[in-house]
Design a protein with these regions (language model features):
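Periplasmic OmpA-like peptidoglycan-binding domain that tethers envelope proteins to the cell wall
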Residues: 307, 445-517
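Short, solvent-exposed beta-strand/turn patches at coil↔beta or beta↔helix junctions
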Residues: 399-438, 448-456
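Short, conserved micro-motifs composed of acidic
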Residues: 23, 58-61, 68, 72-401, ...
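Bacterial Sec-dependent N-terminal signal peptides
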Residues: 1-22
Length: 517
């Protein structure tokens, strides 16, 4: 599994085209562009053009160097004299896109995540758990080989907001071969990852999964031939409801070089997984170029991914799309500058609430890939989603117009309407969503079990609904955006003749309504 290089080489069989000294010059230009020294790259390109006026590859490299320097008009002028191949046309279109997006930047705030989480190597494929208690990355621990070695690292949050020094996961998760591009199930019991050059592999790189038994991960298990082929499979992303696995591959049928696919997941009695119904996401997402690094948000609707298509600024840019109720994906939208640049930008993911994103990009001195945190404007955020913890693990509830969400861990003492302290963390998250989404109003509906009279339970359920609403108001949400209802025991969701059933029936339900027309 090789991470993506800063630009597309026009001529692949370069050894057959150049003498040794020219190969060395090419590599020097390539290195200068990769490391951000585009001034020197431009100088060397011009020198070679004077020597070899009939060789278009130097002019193509010069056009790329101008693109990365930010001189888009010079790049277009340089490229316009070349034969208009697919790659030349794409690079010229990249210049037009880059010029437009840099002149109209989006409201992003980009922050380096520090030297503890980032290592001195290339840091790629960031992953944050839904509970935000572990940050995983893939680290290129040896990029001097023709096939760089990658391992999975992790870091923990500290009270001061920083992260602990990143450490490699132990064996058998990491080996002397390649492991990386990790994705975790919502309950934390499954990890998907990519391994390359394995004895049980089907091709160069395959998708694997591990199961967590207590505090120990099993050895990685190949996902099987339904997903993995003789080709390249990588960058898995599992949906929050554990029903679908998104991934990138160059397997057939494909639209372009690398496409994004999705497969259904089944869980067997012993916990092992099966996969079926592998589908290409189609040309709303995939192009004739490369699409990779999918990240499906917990809302189940919003997909982020990277592409080096004509709509990018050059290299890989992050795009997003949303699926409708009929299963159709919207046309992709470039996430804009400064999240995207003329360099490679990939491995994008978000936190649960969708107000922060994480991305791997070249650092400012051009030395290596590092992880950045990005504050996201509302226009590119996923749908508001809550993480609900219970004794069965983590579940996600998408906030949908008029659909009720029950939080079974909003707790009260028996026969009391005062909130327990342990209930407030969930309500804090709900209040945050309402503060960020001013078009959302909410109905707060109290429910009780059947113990007690009808009138008593109606009154108690109303008091509990009001108590919840008052707490949300105390967090800054306007009281005018809330309505309260007490349903008593009239709408049970479980039998009232057992303790377990009565616990389920004592609940607070939220129904959200958008004020947008």
């Amino acid at each position: 599994m090789k991470y993506f290089l800063p630009f597309i080489i026009l001529f692949l069989s370069i050894n057959s085209l150049y003498a040794k000294s020219e190969i060395e010059i090419y590599n020097e230009i390539y290195s200068n562009i990769s490391n951000g020294d585009v001034t020197e790259a431009i100088k060397l390109c011009k020198k070679q053009i004077k020597k070899q006026k009939k060789n278009p590859s130097w002019q193509y490299l010069l056009g790329e160097a101008y693109l990365y320097s930010g001189d888009f008009s010079m790049s277009i002028e340089t490229l316009s004299t070349l034969p208009q191949t697919k790659d030349v046309r794409r690079l010229m279109q990249n210049c037009i896109v880059a010029d437009s997006l840099t002149k109209n930047p989006s409201q992003y705030s980009v922050k380096y995540m520090g030297d503890s989480l980032n290592t001195t190597h290339d840091n790629i494929w960031p992953t944050l758990t839904p509970t935000e208690d572990i940050f995983f990355t893939t680290v290129v621990v040896n990029n001097k080989m023709s096939f760089p070695q990658e391992d999975i690292y992790y870091s923990l949050p500290m009270e001061d907001g920083r992260w602990t020094i990143a450490k490699a996961l132990p064996a058998p998760l990491n080996t002397e071969e390649n492991e990386g591009s990790q994705s975790f199930s919502a309950d934390g019991k499954y990890m998907f990852l990519v391994r390359c050059n394995q004895k049980d592999g089907y091709g160069s790189c395959d998708i694997y999964y591990c199961m967590k038994k207590g505090d120990v991960w099993t050895r990685p298990i190949n996902a099987g031939k339904v997903i993995n082929t003789r080709n390249w499979e990588s960058t898995p992303s599992v949906s929050a409801d554990f029903s679908k696995l998104y991934f990138s591959s160059n397997q057939k049928p494909n639209v372009g070089a690398k496409d994004i696919f999705v497969a259904d997941i089944g869980v067997l009695a012993d916990g092992h997984l099966e996969f079926f119904n592998v589908k290409n996401l189609g040309d709303s997402i995939n192009t004739i170029y490369d699409e990779t690094a999918p990240f499906i948000h917990a809302d189940g609707v919003t997909l982020y991914y990277s592409s080096n298509c004509e709509k990018s600024m050059g290299g890989l840019d992050v795009f997003f799309s949303q699926i409708d109720s009929s299963g159709n994906w919207s046309r992709c939208l470039n996430m804009g500058y400064p999240l995207n640049t003329t360099r490679d930008n990939f491995g994008f993911c978000t936190n649960l609430t969708g107000d922060k994103g994480y991305i791997s990009s070249l650092n400012t001195n051009g030395e290596n890939m590092v992880i950045y945190e990005v504050s996201l404007p509302k226009s590119v955020r996923p749908l508001p989603t809550l993480l609900i913890k219970n004794n069965k693990g983590n579940n996600f509830s998408k906030i949908t117009d008029g659909i009720g969400i029950s939080l079974d861990n909003v707790l009260f003492d028996f026969n009391e309407s005062t909130l327990l302290e342990s209930s407030k963390s969930q309500l804090d998250k709900l209040a945050k969503i309402m503060l960020e989404s001013q078009d959302l109003n909410v109905e707060i509906i109290g429910h009780t079990d059947s113990i007690g009279s009808v009138d008593y339970n109606l009154e108690l359920s109303m008091k509990r609904a009001i108590s919840v609403g008052e707490y949300i108001v105390s967090q800054g949400v306007s009281a005018s955006r809330m309505q309260y209802f007490g349903k008593g025991a009239s709408e049970p969701i479980a039998p009232n003749n057992t303790d377990a059933g009565r616990v389920q029936n004592r609940r607070i339900e939220f129904k959200f309504y958008s004020t947008k027309k």
